[in-house]
From Swiss-Prot:
Taxonomic source organism: Sus scrofa (Pig)
Secretion signal, residue range per the UniProt entry: 1-17
Similarity comment: family membership: Belongs to the colipase family.
GO molecular function: enzyme activator activity; lipase binding
Protein name: Colipase
Localisation per UniProt entry: Secreted
Principal place of residence: secreted
Biological processes, Gene Ontology terms: digestion; lipid catabolic process; response to bacterium; response to food; retinoid metabolic process
Function: Colipase is a cofactor of pancreatic lipase. It allows the lipase to anchor itself to the lipid-water interface. Without colipase the enzyme is washed off by bile salts, which have an inhibitory effect on the lipase. Enterostatin has a biological activity as a satiety signal.
Annotated S-S bridges: C34-C45, C40-C56, C44-C78, C66-C86, C80-C104
Gene name in the database record: CLPS
């Protein structure tokens, strides 16, 4: 009986030691349900309406709608990809009501 328990203990230890590449709570892929942007690989947890489920989504591309900032960690429009800037409303009221939408622009390219 002791050998069986020891074998079971070793098996469980090895099973827990192997990292799972797919996230359950963090490191979530695009399309998976989320509660906050920090859970997503893309750092964007997005929903369409206040009653809809939030899912991880890709960040906004150039010339697409974006949100500059959110207080809640969930966006209606995702923030811009790296290197782009969200040109639009950056007010506190817009952040509270989650209506601070803009358009992603490449500032470096537009100044040339």
């Amino acid at each position: 009986m002791e050998k069986v328990l020891a074998l079971l203990l070793v098996t469980l230890t090895v099973a827990y030691a192997v990292p799972d590449p797919r996230g359950i709570i963090i490191n979530l892929d695009e399309g998976e349900l989320c509660l906050n942007s920090a859970q997503c690989k893309s750092n964007c947890c997005q929903h369409d309406t206040i009653l809809s489920l939030s899912r991880c989504a890709l960040k906004a591309r150039e010339n697409s709608e974006c949100s500059a900032f959110t207080l809640y960690g969930v966006y209606y429009k995702c923030p811009c990809e790296r290197g782009l800037t969200c040109e639009g409303d950056k007010s506190l009221v817009g952040s509270i009501t989650n209506t601070n939408f803009g358009i992603c622009h490449d500032v470096g390219r537009s100044s040339d």
